[in-house]
Each structure stands twice: as structure tokens, then as C-alpha cells.
Amino acid sequence: MARYFITWEVDPNRAPVDPKERGAAWLMMAEMVKKDIQEGKTTDWGAFVGEGRGYSIGAGEQSLVDLSKDLQRYFPYVTFNVHQVMSVDEVIELSKSMME
């Protein structure tokens, strides 16, 4: 199962200036995130207080193309950095293979 550590950042130049519009946009995106959590695409998500940035943990059998499609739903308002991660067991397996 692939796991991803994703950092995200809202583009402040694209965020609505009006607080009501900005709140509506945030709510829409938060509901999209909640749906991804319910569907198992995202296992954890958080926003850094007062920064317009945060992180997400994704896991599953989702292909990179499908992950990219999901992230494109937030474009151009949010940018992402995606890092595929290994478990400690995978690191141990890699380490042992290096000693062969």
C-alpha cells in the first residue's frame, strides 16, 4: 500500500478578499477533504494555525494519476508537495538488501 505525506498551501493571491466569500471557499474545500477521509483516500489532515498551510496523509491503492486528479480539484487555489514514504519495515528491508 502506498503512503504519501502531502503538504499544502493556499495561494493568498487567489483567496477571496471578502471574509464571507473566503469562508464559503474554505468550507467547500473542507467538505471535499472530509469526503476524502470518509472514502479512505486521506487518513489524516490538518491545517497549521493561522498559516493557510497544512498537511495530509494519504494511503491506499490509489494510483499516482488518481492522486493527481484528486489534487487538481483544488487548483489553482492550493498548491501541494507530495512525498511517497516508506514504513520502518520497508526501510529495514532496504537496509538489509544493501548488505547482500
Q: What is each stretch, according to the model?
A:
Residues 1-53, 62-65, 92-100:
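Short S/T/G/P-rich N-terminal loop/turn motif that feeds into the first structured element of a domain
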Residues 35-36, 59-93:
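An amphipathic, aromatic/His-enriched active-site/gating alpha helix that lines ligand/cofactor pockets
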